[in-house]
């Protein structure tokens, strides 16, 4: 179940919890948004940033025990 977080400090606290298993970073070049998604036991927490400097600092401050994956944009399926 998804849940959006607006505060960076609260997001870092969630990342440090024991039930946080993996993090994904999704970059959208068209809207200049960077989404951080953290999978916990009950919720998938999402933080949306528009500042790339803050995003790099947040990526560096994520705990090393968390599995971090950069997600590339998927190609659209072609119809026959």
From Swiss-Prot:
A single GO molecular function term of this UniProt record: structural constituent of ribosome
Protein's UniProt keywords contain Ribosomal protein: yes
Keywords assigned by UniProt, alphabetized: Cytoplasm, Ribonucleoprotein, Ribosomal protein
Cellular location(s): Cytoplasm
GO CC entries: cytosolic large ribosomal subunit
InterPro entries with a match to the protein in the record: Ribosomal_eL38, Ribosomal_eL38_sf
Principal location listed in the UniProt entry: cytoplasm
Gene Ontology biological process terms in this record: protein-RNA complex assembly; translation
Reported function: Component of the ribosome, a large ribonucleoprotein complex responsible for the synthesis of proteins in the cell. The small ribosomal subunit (SSU) binds messenger RNAs (mRNAs) and translates the encoded message by selecting cognate aminoacyl-transfer RNA (tRNA) molecules. The large subunit (LSU) contains the ribosomal catalytic site termed the peptidyl transferase center (PTC), which catalyzes the formation of peptide bonds, thereby polymerizing the amino acids delivered by tRNAs into a polypeptide chain.
Similarity remark: Belongs to the eukaryotic ribosomal protein eL38 family.
Descriptive protein name: Large ribosomal subunit protein eL38
